[in-house]
């Protein structure tokens, strides 16, 4: 505006005669209609002048931020879209055509602005960012072009960017300064896009060896970090893609002792894949996949220098089958128990039986293993087997097991401390499972075997049982009570969650899902997820979709605890999907 005033003043000083006022008015009106620094069009024009480009990009970013603020962050607001429409193509062309000529600060600021537009017309620039990085990987944190390109494509999901983004991903090293600030954005974008064309290349990524660092050798540590990023992301994306061709690579990760840090993600991917993954695990359990078993043995020897003992691949196969949770896995697991001699493997198989919709045969098999184990028996990767199986007994959500559990407590062996700890744990499992008519048995067990801690928990459980009796919907409401979200009162909510699973039905499950936002305590959210799983034994795409809506909503929340608390919901969601195929 200052420039316009100066020019207008100069014109007036040159005007002569009585016609001056009228002529000046006409010319001034014309000048006001011209572009000036207060208008985005002025700066769009300046993009063509190399010496002005840096300042022009900064000013256009300011225009965009101001427009977005005035529109209350509404990207669809007319004033925001008007600015984008005026600038998106010139900015895109500048990045695409002048990439090599721009200084780093201007170039990165430009791609950030284009990414903020979330506009499909920026595709040539986003593609350029990915391709240039893949061609010549950068390491400086100042060269963060692909950070912004990844954020944009996370929402845009453009088919034409699938391969360029994949190639950039394959070149990104988290061990670099740039990798440290970009890896999360690239991971989230890869997961969001999950292009079907990636199944082959990402399965290949999982074939790369990983050697956990055992020294301070920076090169070895950096290589491990890079592989961890690539392979964890690859496993997660392969699960989302859902292509059965990924099952062999994911299963191979599960038996590779060098990839322990990738295995949790690979396991969830196998759960998503459902039946094809369960079929592969069954083959491994039966010892029929000799190539995979030989690979496992060679990796154990390579990393430890010793031959593996007791066929640990059996435990891995059982873990996969139990986590997937398909009822058709039960015959193979029960059959494996009949021939298995190793206590550790037997304990793992029994634990995994408790994760699958129960049958009389599976409950009997679980009890048989429990009764056969000595107090000193351990379960891989470590810990007392009976301790874990006592907790697992509760996963059946079967009050009919209470008399049997109390018999195990009475017959418990071992040294005094171990025996007392096991008996207290059994009493607590009994308390969780007890229906109103069984609370007297639970109280007797708690008084006999429990400490003051267990006795205090009994009081919480008793209160909620007295309130709700046999009414499943009452327990749903109790699970959602704000008082029970407090850690000191959470056992009342845990008891309520067990009773929802024991007394409820599909209607109860739907009521629970509808009120999950009220369940903020992580332990209660876990119990709620288990109740949903228990009440959906045949799986359900509809229920899975409802859980996914909750997970996606919380993932966008500024409260990171909300997203973290949804881990059990995710696993149940995948299990419900895996049971339907």
Role assignments for model-derived ranges:
Residues 2-32:
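Sec-dependent bacterial lipoprotein signal peptides
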Residues 3-6, 13, 56, 510, ...:
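Positively charged, low-complexity intrinsically disordered regions
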Residues 18-21, 25-26, 474, 495, ...:
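Low-complexity, intrinsically disordered short segments enriched for Gly/Pro and polybasic residues
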């Amino acid at each position: 505006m200052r420039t316009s005033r100066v020019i207008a003043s100069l014109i007036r000083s040159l005007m002569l005669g009585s016609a001056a006022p009228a002529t000046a008015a006409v010319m001034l009106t014309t000048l006001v209609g011209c572009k000036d620094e207060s208008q985005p069009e002025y700066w769009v024009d300046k993009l063509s002048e190399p010496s002005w480009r840096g300042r022009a990009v900064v000013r256009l970013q300011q225009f965009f931020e101001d427009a977005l603020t005035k529109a209350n962050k509404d990207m669809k607001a007319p004033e925001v879209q008007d600015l984008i429409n005026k600038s998106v193509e010139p900015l895109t062309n500048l990045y695409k055509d002048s990439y090599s000529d721009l200084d780093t600060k201007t170039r990165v600021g430009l791609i950030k602005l284009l990414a903020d537009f979330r506009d499909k017309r920026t595709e040539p620039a986003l593609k350029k960012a990915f391709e240039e990085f893949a061609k010549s990987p950068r390491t400086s944190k100042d060269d963060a072009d692909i950070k912004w390109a990844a954020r944009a494509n996370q929402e845009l999901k453009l088919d034409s960017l699938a391969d360029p983004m994949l190639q950039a991903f394959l070149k990104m090293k988290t061990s670099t300064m740039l990798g440290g600030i970009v890896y999360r954005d690239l991971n989230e974008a890869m997961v969001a896009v999950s292009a079907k064309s990636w199944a082959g290349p990402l399965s290949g990524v999982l074939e790369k060896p990983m050697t956990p660092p055992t020294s301070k050798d920076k090169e070895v540590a950096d290589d491990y970090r890079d592989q961890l990023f690539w392979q964890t992301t690859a496993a997660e994306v392969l699960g989302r893609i859902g292509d059965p061709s990924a099952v062999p690579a994911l299963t191979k990760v599960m038996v590779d002792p060098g990839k322990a840090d990738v295995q949790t993600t690979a396991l969830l991917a196998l759960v998503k894949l459902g039946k094809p993954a369960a079929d592969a695990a069954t083959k491994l359990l039966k010892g029929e996949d000799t190539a995979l078993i030989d690979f496992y043995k060679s990796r154990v020897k390579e990393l430890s220098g010793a031959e593996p003992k007791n066929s640990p691949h059996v435990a891995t196969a059982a873990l996969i089958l139990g986590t997937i949770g398909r009822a058709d896995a039960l015959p193979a697991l029960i059959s494996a128990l009949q021939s298995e001699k190793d206590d550790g493997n037997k304990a793992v198989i029994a634990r995994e039986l408790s994760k699958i919709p129960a049958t009389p045969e599976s409950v009997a098999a679980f009890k048989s293993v429990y009764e056969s184990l000595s107090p000193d028996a351990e379960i891989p990767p470590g810990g007392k087997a009976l301790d874990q199986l006592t907790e697992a007994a509760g996963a059946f959500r079967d009050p009919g097991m209470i008399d049997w559990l109390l018999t195990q407590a009475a017959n418990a062996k071992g040294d005094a401390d171990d025996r007392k700890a096991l008996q207290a744990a059994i009493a607590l499992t009994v308390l969780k499972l007890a229906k109103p008519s069984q609370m007297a048995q639970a109280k007797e067990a708690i008084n006999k075997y429990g400490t003051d801690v267990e006795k205090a928990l009994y009081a919480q459980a008793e209160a909620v049982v007295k309130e709700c009796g046999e009414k499943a919907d009452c327990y749903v409401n109790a699970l959602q009570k704000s008082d029970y979200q407090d850690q000191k009162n959470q056992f009342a909510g845990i008891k309520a969650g067990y009773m929802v699973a024991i007394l409820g039905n599909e209607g109860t499950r739907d009521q629970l899902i509808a009120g999950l936002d009220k369940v903020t305590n992580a332990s209660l959210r876990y119990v709620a997820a288990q109740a949903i799983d228990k009440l959906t034994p045949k799986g359900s795409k509809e229920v899975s979709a409802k859980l996914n809506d909750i997970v996606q909503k919380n993932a966008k929340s500024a409260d990171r605890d909300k997203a973290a608390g949804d881990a059990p919901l995710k696993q149940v969601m995948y299990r419900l999907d895996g049971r339907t195929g």
